[in-house]
Amino acid sequence: MRLDPFYLIVDSADWVERLVPLGVKLVQLRIKDRPEPVLREEIRRAKAACAAAACQLIINDYWRLAIDEGCDFIHLGQEDLMAADLAAIRRAGLKLGLSTHDPSELETALAAAPDYVALGPVWPTILKEMKWAPQGVERLADWRRRVGPMPLVAIGGITAERAPLVLENGADSAAVVTDITRNPDPEARTRQWLAATAPWRSVG
């Protein structure tokens, strides 16, 4: 399995509908603390927008809803992984991505046989408080050796200018949140990301 080198993460279907038509091919819908009917509607809208643009949609956390709504890819954090029914996820045919922040979490993730692992934060991030220190690009090279051919996602503090650095140091995909969603011109920044990651999109 290959991931697009530009991995957009957003918190609403509005963002999906706004940015995916620009050429985004990999997007995660990460919504927190909303009622189930709202979540279902957000997933349905995001799924429709992604289907229209041939974009891979990944649902964060809500694996039961992802199964119910016919999605095919989910992402779980370490705490969510402990509570999830991996057998049910696999029976439903969903692909699985997992977050990791240290070697112990990587071992836990690899034991679950995911379809990709994410390492972060590579650089300091303003998105949320993190108990882990920034990993740096050096850790990416180490993770690359540990995971073998499995796709590796870098996340945390990545900008369009930094994306080539993580892709050159072992990551298959660079994940971004605030560099786009908090930019004064998210559409222009998305196009900059598409351009910055283009050399890796055409490889292979």
From Swiss-Prot:
Enzyme class: transferase
Pathway in which this enzyme or protein is active: Cofactor biosynthesis; thiamine diphosphate biosynthesis; thiamine phosphate from 4-amino-2-methyl-5-diphosphomethylpyrimidine and 4-methyl-5-(2-phosphoethyl)-thiazole: step 1/1
GO biological process: thiamine biosynthetic process; thiamine diphosphate biosynthetic process
Keywords, in A-Z order: Magnesium, Metal-binding, Plasmid, Thiamine biosynthesis, Transferase
Alphabetical list of InterPro entries matching this protein: Aldolase_TIM, ThiamineP_synth_sf, ThiamineP_synth_TenI, TMP_synthase
Cofactor or coenzyme needed: Mg(2+)
SUPFAM superfamilies: Thiamin phosphate synthase
CDD domains xrefs: TMP_TenI (cd00564)
Residues annotated to bind Mg(2+): 61, 80
Pfam families in the record: TMP-TENI
Binding locations of 2-[(2R,5Z)-2-carboxy-4-methylthiazol-5(2H)-ylidene]ethyl phosphate: 157, 177-178
Keyword match Transmembrane helix: no
One term under GO cellular component: cytoplasm
Keyword match Magnesium: yes
Record field: catalytic activity: 2-[(2R,5Z)-2-carboxy-4-methylthiazol-5(2H)-ylidene]ethyl phosphate + 4-amino-2-methyl-5-(diphosphooxymethyl)pyrimidine + 2 H(+) = thiamine phosphate + CO2 + diphosphate; 2-(2-carboxy-4-methylthiazol-5-yl)ethyl phosphate + 4-amino-2-methyl-5-(diphosphooxymethyl)pyrimidine + 2 H(+) = thiamine phosphate + CO2 + diphosphate; 4-methyl-5-(2-phosphooxyethyl)-thiazole + 4-amino-2-methyl-5-(diphosphooxymethyl)pyrimidine + H(+) = thiamine phosphate + diphosphate
Main function: Condenses 4-methyl-5-(beta-hydroxyethyl)thiazole monophosphate (THZ-P) and 2-methyl-4-amino-5-hydroxymethyl pyrimidine pyrophosphate (HMP-PP) to form thiamine monophosphate (TMP).
Family designation: Belongs to the thiamine-phosphate synthase family.
Name the UniProt record assigns to this protein: Thiamine-phosphate synthase
